[in-house]
Amino acid sequence: MAAMASFGALALLLLSGLSCCSEACLEPQITPSYYTTSDAVISTETVFIVEISLTCKNRVQNMALYADVSGKQFPVTRGQDVGRYQVSWSLEHKSAHAGTYEVRFFDEESYSLLRKAQRNNEDVSIIPPLFTVSVDHRGTWNGPWVSTEVLAAVIGIVIYYLAFSAKSHIQA
C-alpha cells in the first residue's frame, strides 16, 4: 500500500512538472511576410495570410501561438521548419476595408489571460501581446466598370448599325 501511495505521488509530481508551464519566449525576433487577396472578381472572400519566422533569445522552439485580429482569435499553425508559423483568416469583401490590420500574437499564458478578460467583459487592450505584425491591405479590385461582354455587345450593335445604314445608302 505504501508503494502504491509513493508511486501515485511520484506520478503526480512528474505530471505537475511536465504541465506546469511552457517556457516563455524572451525577446522574440520575427521576420514577417503576408499576403492579402487583391482581386474580388475571382474570389468570394478576402483572404489574409501571415507567415512569420520566430526566434527567441532563450531558444524556445515549437511554442503554441494564438493570433488576435480586431477582437477575433485564431490558432496559429506551426510550419515544418523550426520557428515558422502561419495564421490565416478571411472576411467578406464588404467587411475587408483597405488599411492596416494589427495582428497581435500571444503565447499560451497571455492567451489564457486574454480569454479570461473577454469572458469577464474586461479591457483586453491591457494584456500585452508577445509581438504584433501590421498587415497592409490595399483593398480589392472589383473588375472594370463595364464588363467585356457588355462592351463586345455594344460594339457589335454599332457595327451592325453602321453596316445596315451603309447598305441603305448604297441601295438608295
UniProtKB/Swiss-Prot annotation:
Residues 1-23 form the signal peptide. There is a cross-link at residue 72 (Glycyl lysine isopeptide (Lys-Gly) (interchain with G-Cter in ubiquitin)). The keyword Coiled coil does not apply. The keyword Cell inner membrane does not apply. It is a single-pass type I membrane protein. GO terms for cellular component: endoplasmic reticulum membrane. Keywords: Disulfide bond, Endoplasmic reticulum, Isopeptide bond, Membrane, Signal, Transmembrane, Transmembrane helix, Ubl conjugation. InterPro entries: TRAP-delta. It is found in: Endoplasmic reticulum membrane. Residues 24-143 are lumenal. The chain crosses the membrane at residues 144-164. Disulfide bonds join 25-56. It holds the Pfam family TRAP-delta. Residues 165-172 are cytoplasmic. TRAP proteins are part of a complex whose function is to bind calcium to the ER membrane and thereby regulate the retention of ER resident proteins. Belongs to the TRAP-delta family. PANTHER family: TRANSLOCON-ASSOCIATED PROTEIN SUBUNIT DELTA (PTHR12731:SF1), TRANSLOCON-ASSOCIATED PROTEIN, DELTA SUBUNIT (PTHR12731). Heterotetramer of TRAP-alpha, TRAP-beta, TRAP-delta and TRAP-gamma. This is Translocon-associated protein subunit delta.
